[in-house]
Each structure stands twice: as C-alpha cells, then as structure tokens.
Amino acid sequence: MSQEKQVFSIDLAGRQLTVETGQLAKQANGAVLVRYGDTAVLSTATASKEAKNVDFFPLTVNYEERLYAVGKIPGGFIKREGRPSEKAILASRLIDRPIRPLFADGFRNEVQVVSIVMSVDQDCSSEMAAMLGSSLALSISDIPFEGPIAGATVGRINGEFVINPTVEQQEQSDIHLVVAGTKDAINMVEAGADQVPEETMLEAIMFGHDEIKRLIAFQEEIVQAVGKEKSEVKLYEVDADLNQAVREMAEKDMHSAIQVHEKHAREDAINEVKKRVIEHYEAQEADADTLGQVNEILYKIVKEEVRRLITVEKIRPDGRKGDEIRPLASEVGILSRTHGSGLFTRGQTQALSICTLGALGDVQILDGLGVEESKRFMHHYNFPSFSVGETRPMRGPGRREIGHGALGERALEPVIPSEKDFPYTVRLVSEVLESNGSTSQASICGSTLAMMDAGVPLKAPVAGIAMGLVKTGEHYTILSDIQGMEDHLGDMDFKVAGTAHGVTALQMDIKIDGLSREILEEALQQAKVGRVHILNHMLSVIAEPRTELSAYAPKIITMTINPDKIRDVIGPSGKQINKIIEETGVKIDIEQDGTVFISSINQEMNDKAKKIIEDIVREVQVGEIYEGKVKRVEKFGAFVELFSDKDGLVHISELALERVGKVEDVVKIGDVITVKVIEIDKQGRVNLSRKVLLKEEQEKEAAKEENKQEQQ
C-alpha cells in the first residue's frame, strides 16, 4: 500500500463522504479516516502474526467515543472518558455482527478493529462512518478478510424511504432501520418501527441493500488503488485420520443423543458420548492439541446431525414442528410491593419483568455524543449464570446484556404513552430466570405484562419471537421460537417484536451468503403468526392495563404556571422549592413552558404542595376578596397575609365604618379578617379595605329591611 496520503470521495444521501488513507496510524495493518459531512472517524485494523491456541475466532471490535468530538469536557473529578457509554457498546456490536461472518472457518489469529470518533456532525451518522471505516481498514490491510461490507440507515417519511436521515428527518420517520451486508447479501439488520407492516419492513431492507451495493463498489475502488496483498494464513484443521476415527467411534451414539427432547437430558446424553471418546484418547496419552481436535470433531458431528434432521427430516431437537411455539405460561402481580410485575415462561425460557414508575426527575441523564440529553423509558436486562445452571462470577452487565436490554427498549418504546398523557418515568428490569433460547423476546413479553399490571396505558401490547433458519444446499427450514441449540447451530437468528398491527423491532444476524428475499418474506410472515399466538396468550392473562396504579407507586399531579413565575417557585438558590419539598416530602419537576409535576406516594402531600405553589404564583387582582391573617400591626394600619408570602396593608382609615383611634381597638395580631383589594400601586404594594366590605354588608342589610317594610 502506498504511504502517501490519498483521498477518495462519494456522495451519500446528499452529503459528501471522503476516505483518507496513507497519513494516519500507518503502523496498523490497515487504517482509514472517514469524513462524512463534519463527522470524522479513524478506523484501524490490526492482527496477530500467529494463530492463538483457542477454539474460536478472537475478534474484538471497539467503537470509541471521545467527548472532544462534540466540544465537551467529561464530567466528574477525573475529567477523562471512562467506561464506554451504552450507545458506544451498541455501536461496537452493530459493527462486529456483519464483519464476523466474513472470516474463514479455522482462522484463529487475533484481530482488533478500533474506530475512534473524532468529530461529530449530528446529521451525519458516526456509526455508519465507523462501519464503512472498519470494513475498509480490514479490506486494504493484509488481514484475510472476505469483505468488504457496508451499512446504511433507512427511514420512512410520508411513505417515502430515506437513506441516512438527518436528525430532523428521524423525528418524522416511523422506521429506524440499520441494514448491513455484502454486495450479494444482507447479513445484519437492526430496526425499530412504529407498528409498521412486515411487507414495508422488507421493502426498507431491500432499499437499504441497494445503497450498500454502491458503497461496496466505492470500497472496491479504494482497495484496488491502495490495498495490500493478503497474508497467507494457515487455517486450523483437524487431522483427517483422527476425524474418521472419532466419527466411527461416536457418530451413531451421538445421533441418538441428539434426539432426546428435554434440554438437560439431551445435554447429559451428548456429554456422556463426548466423555467416553475423550477418555479413550486420554488413555492413549493424547496431547492437548489432539484432545482439542477431538472436541472440535465431536462439535461438528452434533452440528451436522442437528442441521440434517431439521432440513431433511424436518425434526427439531425437542420434537416440535417448524412453526410450533413451545408451551406458554404467564402470571402478573406476583411481587406485592413493586409497581407492576410479569412472569413469562416459554418452554425452558423464563423471564420475570418488573415495572417501576418514577417522577419525571428520575429520567436517565445521557452524557454522550448524541443530541438526546435524557430518556424517560428504560429497559434493563439481566442474565445471571443460574439461568443456565452454571456458576460464574457476578459482574456488571456485559455487551450482550446491554444489547438485549436495548432491543427490548426499542421494541416497547413505540407503545409507551406520551409524557403529556402519562407524566411518569418508566423503568423495566427483566431478570432471566431460565434460559433455553429467545430470552430477549421473553423479556419483551414479560415487560408488556409488567407494564399492564402497573397500569401503564400502553398504546398496544407487544410480544416478541425469535425465528431461525437452517439451510443445507437447496433444502431449508424456517423455525419459529428457536431454542438455544437451534440458535447456536443454525444459519440465522431473526428476532421480531411487535403488536397485532405491525413490527416495532427487528434484529437479524445471518451466518450464510445468498439469503433470498423470498426466504426473508416467509420468515417475517411466519413470525407474525407466532407473535399473534403469543399475544393472544398474554391477553388471556391480563386483557388491558389496570385502571389504577399500585398503592406504592407515586401519585403525580400536573399544574401549569406562568413561565415568568418559575423563578418565584424556585426562589434564590432553590431556597423556596427546597422549603416546599422539605415541608411536604414531594418531588417537584418544572418544565420551561411552566408545566409543574408534583409527585409522592401521599396524595394529601401532593395537594398541599400544589396549594403552596398556587399561592406563590397567584396574582392579586383589584376587586378580589380574601380572608387573611393579621401578621403585623403599626400605628398607621394592619398588615394582612392574603396567601403565602403575599401581604397587603389595611390603612387605619379602612379598618371600620367609624373613625378608629387605635388599630389595636379593631384588630390584633393573629386575627382572621375579610378584606377587599382596592388598589395595587406602581411599586406593587397592595392596599386593602375592611371598611368597604362592612359598608357593602350594611347596605345589603338596609336594602333587606326596606324590602321587608314594603311587603308589609
């Protein structure tokens, strides 16, 4: 590859995309700087010279955010970036998924792909720039990568598809789709949608693939100009004689073990065959490399037989038909003190979801590179080791947990009521209690149940299902509700979530080339049938959201004040609002438009806080009548508190009908008297009169007396 800087350009969605090579990070195997509008991402690819002694392909993909890219200094004492944000983790997964299948089987050299986001233009996606950059860095390097790949974001506005929509366009779009693949096939889809029909989603995927083909042709030109020759790498292979010997020893028993229907019994039967074969070679004092090869051969025997049974004989490991859903069971309200809970069980997969309602001040604050500053709906997914009967250290959420949590969040977000209709922050936590495939979709179903139990007025209930595909030659089988073994050994993992009306989320990963539109269409339609079946089951448990919130959920009341009065409610350095909070124990959130949200478990305290705020912002009007308490007495009159922090003066001449010599002769401190506002002077001082009301009362009495006499 030439070490001189070279620049290549293409138009992408009406904005220029340029690729620079030969100037930055020249010690990496491959490096490119991708500029898209004002977005700039440096992508690099490096690989170890020797293969690693592992039984998998050690690929790491990192998408690194730098806050200088948006002119921010990180918060906290350290003032530097810490652990990756959730968005960065999701972007890393997004890039990893289409790249990983394009390395040869048996390639065991460690590969690291790093994209550093150096400048961000919000209208020009840094994730898409990083995906293109990652593919190009690998493609122009000497690493044996079988790409390139490319990705595109697709939106839909007023029925028209849009490539790489701007921030403004995204707000109008009812589809948020990321599709990636090679020039021949799609191998990754990640999408959120507002109950969009399956046919429309398929059209959007194909629309995105047309753009991908153009971007790949652009990459191929760059590779032709500056690409290095690919390294000759020895791929991991098992010994042919050993392969034959192990197969003769294990195939028959392994085929029988695979057809045991129950998961744990099947695993025990397979492990028994493996143990017998391994012990045979250990007795012959086989070295670690040979034992590793034996394990690899045994794994391939299982994979080949499972795939053959599914595609040729149409037999699934647990005996189900291709479109059959595992037995379903659901329950709500099983945790008394939580705001809402839902238990969803599908075969040997079980998720317990809990819904917690909070005030709007409980929103998650986002400190990243995007324009979004907070979010009021969250879904968190936990996958403890006991869910698969294993022991493992208990650590924080990994990439998988964050990815599954985000998928559930994306699936449910379109049906969450607006802040205006439901002024609560909603947090969902899904605890996976048992796992045998499709746990992310079980968490979506459990979360829907939990929110309905909590009384969240969902626009529509959502269910999710994981579809699979096994393709051998011309034979293929689409599987509904895949379990762990089918996911691991199959060719496609296609998760579809949505309502009875349409799709709200899609996630698809494909391990093979040449997946036709017809197969995708069939998979989507089969998924719809399964999804509706699951929804009907869920609605048989709880038909609609509860009409009342939990007694333990915060009660929220909303009021509107003049925006000019916000500072009066807050007070200097927050003194006034903190006083209200201390006195009532409520939470208070104030929007810039003057909307005030008051929340606490105690409705009485909410009402008290509302009354205090009403008094603070209340405007005194001439002619209004108040019942107030005498707060101070002076020689010239009495000061009366009309409402909180608002006093007026009753001059001595306005205290009574007769002449008053001493104020104390009529009122004293603590007396409650009725007064009328007669004037507000230029300085805002309020002048009151008791005499006016007494005179009015006197005139009424006189009129009554006169009427009485006339009637006599």
UniProtKB/Swiss-Prot annotation:
Swiss-Prot/TrEMBL cofactor(s): Mg(2+)
SUPFAM superfamilies recorded: Eukaryotic type KH-domain (KH-domain type I) (SSF54791), Nucleic acid-binding proteins (SSF50249), Ribonuclease PH domain 2-like (SSF55666), Ribosomal protein S5 domain 2-like (SSF54211)
Keyword Repeat part of the UniProt annotation: no
Catalytic activity: RNA(n+1) + phosphate = RNA(n) + a ribonucleoside 5'-diphosphate
Domain KH: from-to ranges: 554-613
A single BP term in Gene Ontology: RNA processing
Cell location: Cytoplasm
GO cellular component, one term: cytosol
Alphabetical list of PROSITE patterns matching this protein: KH_TYPE_1, S1
Signal peptide: none
Enzyme class: transferase
Chief location: cytoplasm
Record's keyword annotation contains Ubl conjugation: no
GO MF, one annotated term: magnesium ion binding
Coiled coil region boundaries: none
Domain S1 motif: from-to ranges: 623-691
Residue positions binding Mg(2+): D487, D493
Alphabetized UniProt keyword annotations: Cytoplasm, Magnesium, Metal-binding, Nucleotidyltransferase, RNA-binding, Transferase
The enzyme's E.C. designation: 2.7.7.8
Pfam name, any one: S1
InterPro entries: ExoRNase_PH_dom1, ExoRNase_PH_dom2, ExoRNase_PH_dom2_sf, KH_dom, KH_dom_type_1, KH_dom_type_1_sf, NA-bd_OB-fold, PNPase
Its biological purpose: Involved in mRNA degradation. Catalyzes the phosphorolysis of single-stranded polyribonucleotides processively in the 3'- to 5'-direction.
Family annotation (HAMAP family): PNPase (MF_01595)
Entry's family note: Belongs to the polyribonucleotide nucleotidyltransferase family.
Protein name per UniProt: Polyribonucleotide nucleotidyltransferase
Source species of the chain: Bacillus cereus (strain AH820)
